[in-house]
């Protein structure tokens, strides 16, 4: 799923249109939640799917998990406007269930085109759904978190989803360790430019 020459994030949004490609369109979606942020971002965050707050506002990570993500971004010296934030799926599954692999497969090509356009230096995958869809691995987040992985020459850092951290705050320390690795890598590559 390669982007076309000169394609922009807005072009992808237009291609998605008023999407009816999978059952999520009719299951409880109010708004399609598109990837948002800096199209020249060096850092991208990818989550699972919108929740109720995101569905209502049409923006990714705006609920309690989003507030925590904002704090994580600020803790590594960046602002939300500096990064790109999206999800594997753009429509909310009913009752916040995990999207099926078939639903994810329909949305995933749009995410991969966005990554190909922006080419962020680091992609932080938040939780198992993002991990499994970007890296095509069956390993769980607990096993691979904190280790840089490769996606087409880009660094990928798997870590816990902020919603999980709200349920289990004891994992915040590990997430902070992961994010320090991201910060240090971005600082190092910036110094080398």
Indicate where each model-derived feature is located.
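A polyanion-binding, active-site-adjacent surface
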Residues: 1-193
């Amino acid at each position: 799923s390669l982007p076309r020459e000169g394609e922009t994030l807005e072009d992808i949004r237009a291609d998605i249109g008023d999407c009816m490609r999978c059952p999520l369109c009719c299951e409880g979606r109010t708004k399609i939640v598109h990837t948002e942020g800096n199209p020249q971002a060096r850092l991208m965050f990818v989550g699972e799917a919108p929740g109720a707050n995101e569905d209502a506002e049409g923006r990714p990570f705006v609920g309690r998990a989003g507030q925590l993500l904002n704090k994580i971004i600020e803790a590594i010296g960046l602002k939300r406007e500096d990064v790109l934030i999206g999800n594997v799926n753009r429509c909310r599954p009913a009752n916040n269930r995990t999207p099926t692999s078939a639903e994810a497969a329909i949305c995933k090509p749009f995410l991969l085109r966005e990554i190909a356009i922006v080419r962020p230096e680091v992609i932080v995958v938040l939780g198992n759904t993002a991990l499994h869809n970007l890296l095509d691995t069956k390993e769980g987040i607990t096993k691979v978190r904190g280790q840089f992985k490769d996606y087409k020459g880009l660094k990928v850092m798997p870590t816990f989803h902020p919603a999980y951290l709200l349920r289990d705050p004891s994992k915040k320390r590990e997430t902070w360790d992961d994010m320090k690795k991201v910060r240090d890598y971005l600082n190092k590559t910036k110094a080398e430019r």
